[in-house]
């Protein structure tokens, strides 16, 4: 049989256990109350959270893919432009630019259209102005 001190210890351990469980439950509910939302579109339901400019797991799946494509697209365009403009180191700048503009005229229509779509309004104007100044395009 249990004496009085053992009963007190048993009751104290049970109350401590229930208090700990209550604290854990309160913690879980407070975490669940704060719904995670996408930093871009604000959605709270997604099959996968992706990293973005705000931090890891801050974007929903769709926004994360879109963000990654934007970042990749810019770097690939820069690489292509660097490769096409670097050509030969001993040529003059004007000759390499003229060659690039001539290549632009020779390329297929679809690739030229894609390139124009990627360029902004100011970039298109700059390319046309350079083409006019080198005489490869007539007004």
Curated annotation (Swiss-Prot):
Keywords: DNA-binding, Metal-binding, Nucleus, Transcription, Transcription regulation, Zinc, Zinc-finger. A zinc finger (GATA-type) spans 32-86. The keyword Zinc-finger applies. CDD domains: ZnF_GATA. It is found in: Nucleus. InterPro entries: Znf_GATA (IPR000679), Znf_NHR/GATA (IPR013088). SMART domains: ZnF_GATA. One of its GO terms (cellular component) is nucleus. One of its GO terms (molecular function) is transcription cis-regulatory region binding. PROSITE patterns: GATA_ZN_FINGER_1 (PS00344), GATA_ZN_FINGER_2 (PS50114). Residues 67-98 are annotated as: Disordered. Belongs to the type IV zinc-finger family. Class B subfamily. Transcriptional regulator that specifically binds 5'-GATA-3' or 5'-GAT-3' motifs within gene promoters. PANTHER family: GATA TRANSCRIPTION FACTOR 16, OS01G0976800 PROTEIN. This is GATA transcription factor 16. The lineage of its organism: Eukaryota, Viridiplantae, Streptophyta, Embryophyta, Tracheophyta. The gene is GATA16.
